């Protein structure tokens, strides 16, 4: 699940749709867009009860954890093995705060436009699933 602030615009829309089609073979992916004034908190799943295995919320953030592609694929597989759906939250141009996020993910040390961050995230999700499936794509 990718929850993003703001409406995706060209040329990024086509790239996101491209990776969405590629990912469909490997995983169910839902993209939800919210207006900047709407806030993301009300669209996120409720926190699981103590010891529960509800959704895992990861906020894309400059100060988040960075992974190489293989480690990111293991991160996803660990959540899958735990029976947890992963929700990635992509903030708007001014960022966003998600207090219930269990994890903060950085796509790298450079600042990216929030719409480009969606493309990079989907490409990395596709790459991770190809790695997990043992299929060629990642070199």
Segments from the language model and where they lie:
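Short histidine/acidic/glycine/proline-rich micro-motifs that form metal-
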Residues: 6-10, 63, 111
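Structured adenosyl-cofactor binding patch, chiefly the S-adenosyl-L-methionine
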Residues: 94, 98-139
């Amino acid at each position: 699940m990718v929850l993003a602030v703001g409406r995706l615009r060209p040329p990024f829309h086509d790239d996101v749709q491209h990776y969405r089609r590629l990912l469909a073979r490997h995983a169910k992916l839902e993209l939800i867009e919210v207006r900047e004034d709407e806030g993301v908190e009300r669209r996120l799943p409720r926190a699981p009860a103590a010891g529960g295995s509800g959704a895992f919320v990861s906020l894309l953030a400059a100060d988040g954890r960075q992974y190489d592609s293989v480690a990111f694929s293991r991160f996803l597989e660990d959540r899958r093995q735990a029976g947890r759906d992963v929700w990635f939250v992509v903030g708007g141009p001014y960022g966003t705060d998600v207090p219930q996020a269990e994890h903060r993910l950085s796509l790298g040390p450079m600042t990216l436009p929030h719409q480009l961050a969606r493309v990079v995230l989907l490409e990395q999700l596709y790459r991770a699933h190809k790695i997990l499936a043992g299929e060629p794509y990642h070199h």
